[in-house]
Amino acid sequence: MTEPYYQSSNLYLKYSMPQSKYFKLSEEVVDILVAKTQSQNRHFFRLLVAYYFSKVASMMRTNIDTRDRGVIPVNTYVLNLMPSGAGKGFSTNIMEEDVIEGFRLRFLQHILPHYSNLQIIKLASNRQTIDPTLDSTQANDLVQKEYDALGTLAFSFDSGTAPAVKQMRQKLLMANAGSMNLELDEVGSNLTANVEMLNTFLELYDVGKVKQKLTKNTKENTRGEELMGKTPTNMMLFGTPTKLLDGSRVEEEFKQMLETGYARRMLFGFESTISTGKSQTAEELYNALTCTNVDTNIKRIEKLISNLADINKFNTVLTLSKDDTIHLLKYKIMCEKASEDLKAHEDTKKAELAHRYYKALKLAGAYAFVEGSKTITRIHLDSAIQLCEDSGEHFNRVICKEGAYARLARYIAEIGKEVTQVDLIEELPFYKGSESQKKDLLKLAVAWGYKNNIIIRRTYVDDIEFLSGESLKETDINKLQVAYSNDITEGFELNTTDFGQLHKLTGAKDMHYTAHTFIGNYRSGDKAIPGFDLLILDIDGGCSLN
């Protein structure tokens, strides 16, 4: 295989290969999601598939035996942001109901009962060792009672508390099977209510360990035995970008989460527009939505995923060869070197970039497991790295999103009418706070607009402030407007040219030219049409070109 080429930039590491190499099975599922939803946002679907592949692998307690970090679990954290109507809910339902439903049933009905019974017997035996007065039946009943008291294992959940997460973790440790899978929809609306739980997930990412909280032991609330072990966790946060990155407290909390450690743990997807591809007729759309090949592929992939719920595949420990480990370490070194090139204040970007290789390793493990491989190959690594690189670009879209002042300036310029403070408060969720805070935000918007071709004007009527704005169109030097004629006053027709060709006009003999156009093509000040994109300096010899 051709050695990959690495090239660093100030924002993200560009990892390129001879051709784009996404994981084959993942792309097959993505093709199905594209066909079913008619949405062309493939990166969103790739992350969605990556999450569910990792979920399947971690439920089966798949681990990676690395040569440098020891044994680590396969798991993935994902943040996927797309506008409403882009197919988030539809594609998620397809994954749950058509792709992994067979696996879910087989796992809950066969794998979980089998391994939980074995673990309960083992724990009961340990209890007997500690307390010889217990017979095997008594010890087994005690452990079974504790296990049942922890409730039914949740295959996935959409919210919770830190104590509930730790209780679920205790259930997983006693079962010695399964993983915790948080799937939080409308993350912008639900982030603040789940901060405590998300902080716990922060600790669980690397190896699936978290310290228990010290609680008072009472007769009614007995502190249970702390079991040592690892419990893999997966997380998928999805919603709309405008709700999460709203310039208010929610966005501040989210940015703090990234700084705290989620930047290095998550794969990112950020799309501000819906891509639907080429337009179709109603009949073409019907044929695409009812294509039998798509349904056939879904059934084939569902069966493949369902067969992964096999006792022989449980607790798979994936390995890497020396060459493939070196291949990954090369990527790790390049990630770290590229992160060192970032500015000192870009801590969040540094963390995301420096740990990108680790996310790729975990994802490669998921790819290897669903393919039925016992080893992580270079193909798995390159596929995972490709997606992590895409994630890095989307992460920078998230972290470099325009500030509230820029959005305020654009709103005033694009609304097309005068607005008052009342309009701003009603229309813009980020335009909040005290009068002085809003005044400062508006001041920043005016300053930002000044450097970004936006003019904001203020007028006052009866002490009421009216704001209006306009955007100056950026000049395209390949389409400059110029009028010229071989007559000094007549025949000045409008033409467009690029800047590189202007010297032919200015050097032509007996040719007159202007930056303006004129009514009736007649050159006269009173007939000039307002607007120009070319500035002509008439210098008669008082300035040296040198």
Regions found by a protein language model. Give the residues of each.
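Signature for HUH/AEP ssDNA processing cores
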Residues: 476-546
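Phosphate-handling catalytic cores of nucleic-acid transaction enzymes
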Residues: 1-475
